[in-house]
From Swiss-Prot:
Disruption phenotype: RNAi-mediated knockdown results in 79% embryonic lethality and 19% larval lethality. Abnormal localization of epidermal structural protein pat-12 during embryogenesis. Residues 286-433 are annotated as: Coil 2. It holds the Pfam family Filament. GO terms for molecular function: structural constituent of cytoskeleton. Residues 434-588 are annotated as: Tail. Cytoplasmic intermediate filaments provide mechanical strength to cells. Essential protein, involved in attachment structures in epidermal cells that connect muscles to the external cuticle. Required in morphogenesis and epidermal integrity. Probable component of embryonic epidermal attachment structures. Functions in larval muscle attachment independently of ifa-2. Residues 85-116 are annotated as: Coil 1A. This is Intermediate filament protein ifb-1. Residues 131-268 are annotated as: Coil 1B. Residues 14-30 have a biased composition (Polar residues).
Length: 589
């Protein structure tokens, strides 16, 4: 009974202290249980149980801090396991010494021991054969791990080359995009210059049109003045003719008066001939004086009238001629000016047509360039999305391979520890009676435990592994890039490279495990810049209200946590624009 108690003190369980990692691999291994001691209830026993479990790694990138913590935890766990194995080896040595002491007290079992000695070689060979297969399997696993590591290195090198190629294509696309922008800027400036020139020509055309209207009005006015001058000339000509007629009438009247005067003179001469000589002489002298005076008077009147008529006629003729000359000169100048303006208008219309054609061609070219730029941007964004998807897939594959390699290394370490224990048990201890009993009893107990679960061993309690998956989708440029697992914040991202996105009056709906729903309305006029994020914190979670970078949801102190969480972004029309789904699955072994 005492030996059973003492042996039960050595009964212990070995577990890997490495924490479960989600979404990669789960592997467990349990070594054989060894119980050594006498037969019956009083015999001692020892159970050695080793369980190595690896959870699955969460899909996503492994941060450097997490890798450093994992490496540190792994080293601490390895040191602890080494110390535990050293303690087990020391206890095994003590146990062997105790077996030696028990051999002296169990001389009565010499016959049974002799019988067992006959079976030593067979059992030892079976053990060697059995563990030789395990060693071969372990070596094969190590070789497979090395081969997989080489494959991973090859894939990583290929992915690096792909990444360099994508980076080169990205830089090429950026250069072409900058070149297209410069061309668009140049063409835009050329269009602006052409438009300004067109506007200037239109203003000049309008000015020439106004000047043509003014010249036409002046021409009409001068033509009216010319017609008026011609009418005045006709009137003056008629007046001159009237005056000439009056002069002719006066001349005829003068001739008539002269004839009358001559007749009177003849009559007076006749009377004078009949009168005395003195009287005749007197009247003759008087009559001569009177005739001379009348003649002089009529000569002066006729000469003055003639001079007045000639001077007035010459004045009117000169005025009419001057008006006609001025009208002709102005008419000629206006005709020349109108002709020149018509030529200028024709030239300007031709230039305007050419500029309009050139402007239409430039506008078409700008439109084609805009279409090409849009296509290039779409192809560039598609290439970026493909690159991101490839990088995520490569990262996931690398994480999977790293986890598998870590699992193989853990398995190798565990097998090395077991091999060291078995080697210590087999080398140099086969000649000892107590060790032979222990090995035989261990083999018997191991074969028995493979068939049924006895009361002499304790059941291994399974460890829980957690697997969390995230799924995102979006119908536009705004996506729900991140939801904090602890419900602190929700992050929106504008994935477009050069377009603002207005998320004002949008709503965020977060449904927890299909029961509770949290709704938050984004304030109006909140715009997310291209490539930027908008983080919406719950109340008292360390956020500040600084739109458009961050907002604070005062209605709740947490966004909530759960096993099945669906977060969606709904616009003002009630249309769902983006979703983020988080599912957590727990499994035990």
């Amino acid at each position: 009974m005492s030996s059973h108690k003492e042996s039960s003190e050595y009964e212990m369980q070995y577990r890997s202290t490495i924490q479960p990692r989600t979404a990669v691999r789960s592997q467990s291994r349990q070594s054989g249980n060894y119980v050594s001691g006498g037969n019956g209830a009083g015999s001692g026993g020892r159970v050695l149980k080793m369980v190595t479990e690896m959870g699955s790694a969460t899909v996503g990138g492994i941060s450097p801090a997490l890798s450093a913590n994992a490496a540190k935890s792994f080293l601490e766990a390895t040191d602890k396991e080494k110390k535990t194995l050293q303690g087990l080896n020391d206890r095994l040595g003590n146990y062997i010494d105790r077996v030696k002491k028990l051999e002296e007290q169990n001389r009565k079992l010499v016959a049974d021991l002799d019988e067992l000695r006959g079976k030593w070689g067979k059992d030892t060979s079976e053990i060697k054969i059995k563990y030789s297969e395990s060693l071969s399997t372990a070596r094969k696993d190590i070789d497979d791990a090395a081969r997989r590591k080489a494959e991973v290195d090859v894939k990583v090198a290929r992915h690096r080359d792909d990444l360099a190629e994508y980076r080169s294509r990205y830089e090429d696309i950026q250069q072409r995009r900058e070149s297209d922008r410069e061309k668009i800027s140049q063409w835009t400036n050329a269009i602006a210059d052409a438009q300004s020139e067109v506007e200037m020509l239109r203003a000049r055309f309008k000015q020439l049109t106004d000047e043509e209207k003014r010249v036409t009005a002046d021409n009409s006015r001068i033509w009216e003045e010319l017609q008026k001058a011609r009418s005045d000339l006709d009137d003056e000509t008629i007046g001159r003719i009237d005056f000439q007629n009056q002069v002719q009438t006066l001349m005829e009247e003068l001739e008539f008066l002269r004839r009358v005067h001559e007749q009177e003179v003849k009559e007076l001469q006749a009377l004078l001939a009949q009168a005395p000589a003195d009287t005749r002489e007197f009247f003759k002298n008087e009559l001569a004086l009177a005739i001379r005076d009348i003649k002089d008077e009529y000569d002066i009147i006729a000469k003055q009238g003639k001079q007045d008529m000639e001077s007035w006629y010459k004045l009117k003729v000169s005025e009419v001629q001057g008006s006609a000359n001025r009208a002709n000169m102005e008419s000629t100048y206006q005709r020349d000016e109108v002709k020149r303006m018509r030529d200028n208008i024709g030239d300007l219309r031709g230039k305007l047509g050419d500029l309009e054609n050139k402007n239409s061609l430039l506008e078409k070219e700008v439109q084609n360039l805009n279409y090409q730029l849009t296509d290039d941007q779409r192809q560039y964004e598609a290439a970026l999305n493909d690159r991101d998807a490839t990088l995520r897939r490569m990262r996931e594959e690398c994480q999977t391979l790293v986890a598998e390699l870590q699992a193989l290394l853990d398995t190798k370490q565990m097998l090395d520890a077991e091999i060291a224990i078995y080697r210590k048990m087999l080398e140099g201890e086969e000649t000892r009676v107590g060790l032979t009993q222990m090995v035989e009893q261990a083999v018997k107990t191991h074969s028995l435990q493979q068939q049924e679960n006895t009361d002499s061993t304790r059941s291994v309690r399974g460890e829980v592994s957690t697997k969390t998956t995230f799924q995102r989708s979006a119908k536009g440029n705004v996506t729900i890039s991140e939801c904090d697992p602890n419900g602190k914040f929700i992050k929106l991202e504008n994935s477009h490279r050069n377009k603002d996105e207005n998320v004002g009056e949008h709503k965020i709906r977060r449904k927890l495990d299909g029961r509770r729903e949290i709704v938050y309305s984004i304030p109006a006029n909140v715009v997310i810049k291209p490539g930027k994020n908008l983080t919406i914190y719950a109340r008292d979670q360390g956020g500040i209200n600084n739109p458009p970078e961050s907002l604070v949801f005062d209605g709740e102190n947490t966004w909530g946590i759960g096993a099945n969480v669906v977060t969606s972004l709904v616009n003002k029309d009630g249309e769902e624009r983006a979703t983020h789904t988080q599912k957590t699955i727990q499994s035990g072994q």
